[in-house]
């Protein structure tokens, strides 16, 4: 179940419409799409993109996105902990970070000006667009299992720009 956790009030939201409204009020786009494809752990990037082409292609065309790829994070990945550490550091991007979760789950953390830090646990079917310049970090968890389609205007825009704030250190105990 998709959840949104507010660290200051310790309130957890579970209603998709309420989560969408909360995120929208902070400039973050959130939708839920169907995920009918039955994907194996070994499904290739081409297989995953083909399985969702009927919704992905029109979405990309309507929003000016040029390319997509698949991130497949699971416990069998070599050096997962080192990879996880890169995602766990607060950063921004020079373009929107758009992810469509097709399997598993992951935790997006947000540190927005004027708002207490909060996180969104995204799962299969969730589409989230983190606006460019938004301070955030991502956690696939200590035992990862997530397949997500990454959607780009320009793949160079995905390069993380680390803030160096280390605010994420305060929240390391909260994970999937």
From Swiss-Prot:
The record marks 96 as: May play a role in transmitting local conformational changes. It is an enzyme of class 1 (oxidoreductase). It catalyses: 1,2-dihydroxy-5-(methylsulfanyl)pent-1-en-3-one + O2 = 3-(methylsulfanyl)propanoate + CO + formate + 2 H(+); 1,2-dihydroxy-5-(methylsulfanyl)pent-1-en-3-one + O2 = 4-methylsulfanyl-2-oxobutanoate + formate + 2 H(+). Pathway: Amino-acid biosynthesis; L-methionine biosynthesis via salvage pathway; L-methionine from S-methyl-5-thio-alpha-D-ribose 1-phosphate: step 5/6. Its cofactor is Fe(2+); Ni(2+). Keywords: Amino-acid biosynthesis, Dioxygenase, Iron, Metal-binding, Methionine biosynthesis, Nickel, Oxidoreductase. The record marks 99 as: Important to generate the dianion. GO terms for molecular function: acireductone dioxygenase (Ni2+-requiring) activity; acireductone dioxygenase [iron(II)-requiring] activity; iron ion binding; nickel cation binding. Its EC number is 1.13.11.54, 1.13.11.53. GO terms for biological process: L-methionine salvage from methylthioadenosine; L-methionine salvage from S-adenosylmethionine. The record marks 90 as: May play a role in metal incorporation in vivo. Belongs to the acireductone dioxygenase (ARD) family. Catalyzes 2 different reactions between oxygen and the acireductone 1,2-dihydroxy-3-keto-5-methylthiopentene (DHK-MTPene) depending upon the metal bound in the active site. Fe-containing acireductone dioxygenase (Fe-ARD) produces formate and 2-keto-4-methylthiobutyrate (KMTB), the alpha-ketoacid precursor of methionine in the methionine recycle pathway. Ni-containing acireductone dioxygenase (Ni-ARD) produces methylthiopropionate, carbon monoxide and formate, and does not lie on the methionine recycle pathway. HAMAP family: Salvage_MtnD. Monomer. This is Acireductone dioxygenase. It comes from Picosynechococcus sp. (strain ATCC 27264 / PCC 7002 / PR-6) (Agmenellum quadruplicatum). The gene is mtnD.
């Amino acid at each position: 179940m998709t959840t949104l956790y507010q660290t200051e009030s310790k309130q957890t939201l579970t209603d998709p419409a309420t989560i969408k409204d909360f995120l929208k009020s902070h400039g973050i786009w959130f939708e839920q799409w169907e995920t009918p494809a039955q994907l194996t752990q070994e499904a290739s990037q081409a297989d995953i993109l083909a399985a969702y082409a009927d919704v992905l292609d029109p979405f990309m065309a309507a929003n000016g996105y040029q390319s997509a790829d698949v991130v497949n994070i699971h416990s069998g990945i070599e050096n997962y902990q080192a990879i996880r550490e890169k995602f766990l550091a607060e950063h921004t991007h020079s373009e929107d970070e758009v992810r469509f979760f097709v399997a598993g789950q992951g935790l997006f953390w947000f540190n927005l000006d004027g708002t207490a830090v909060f996180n969104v646990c995204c799962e299969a079917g969730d589409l989230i667009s983190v606006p460019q310049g938004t301070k955030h970090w991502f956690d696939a968890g200590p035992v990862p299992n997530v397949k997500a389609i990454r959607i780009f205007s320009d793949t160079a825009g995905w390069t993380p720009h680390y803030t160096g704030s280390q605010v994420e250190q305060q929240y390391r105990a909260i994970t999937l």
